[in-house]
Amino acid sequence: MERVETRKNPNDRDPVSVKTTRVIPSGTGTDKIPVNADGHPLDPAEYRLRLEGLERALALIVDNNRAQREAMEKYARRRKDRNEVIDATRNAFLFTFVGHELRGDRVLEKYEMWPNPAFKATSRFASILIRVHGYVWIDENAGELARLEGEVTEDVPFGLFFGKIYKGSHFLQERYEVQPGMWQPTFSQYDFDGRKLFSAFSIHERSSYSNYRYIGPPKEALEVIRKELGRADLNNPDSRAAGR
C-alpha cells in the first residue's frame, strides 16, 4: 500500500490531504486503487471494477495484443531512461566515507556526496544533480542502498529558464529489504519549492509504502488477480494477495 500525505508547509503537523492506494503492477506501469487506512476498499463495487479493468489489461498483454505490446515497449523505454539516470547519478557525485551507523541490527556505511566537477549534465534531471549535496547509506552486508538524503544547494533553472527549483529544497528516502533479496522504498519525503512561469509552487509530500507482495510477470499477475476476483469478499484485506 502507498500512503501519501500532502502538506502546505513542510513543518505543518497535520496534512491537508491523505491518499491511501493499493499499488499493483499492470505490465505497462502501475495501477493505483483507492483504499482506506486499513486497506479496505472505499467502494467495494468500484474496487471490483478497477480489478476487472486490470484483469483485462493483463490478459491483453498475455495474449500479445498489439496495442498493449506497444505500451509495454514504451514502458520499457521509460525504465531504460530511468536506469540511465541512475547510472548518471553514480558519475555525478564524488563520495567520501563518513563512518558506520546502526539501523536496528544492520550496519550501514555512510557516505557524503558532493557534485563531481568533471560531470557534464545532459538532461534536465542531471542538471539538478550538479546542484545537490547529501548523504547515502549502504547496507554493509547486502551492498544495497538503505537511505538517501539530499538538499539543493543553489537554484535550479528548468523549462528554458521559465521555471526554477529553489535552493534549500530537500528529499529523503528510506529503503528496506521487504522480501529476501528485494529492497524497496518504505518511506520518502519531498520538500520542493520553486516557481513556474509567474506562479510559485510547493511540493511537500511524505509517502509510506507497506505490505509489499511479489505477484510476478503479467501471466502470473493475471492469475493472482483472477483468483482475487473469484473470492466473494473483496472487502477483507486478508483475502487479497497482490500489490503492496
Which role fits each region the language model picked out?
Residues M1-H133, E140-A146, E151-S169, E177-Q184, ...:
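Structured extracytoplasmic
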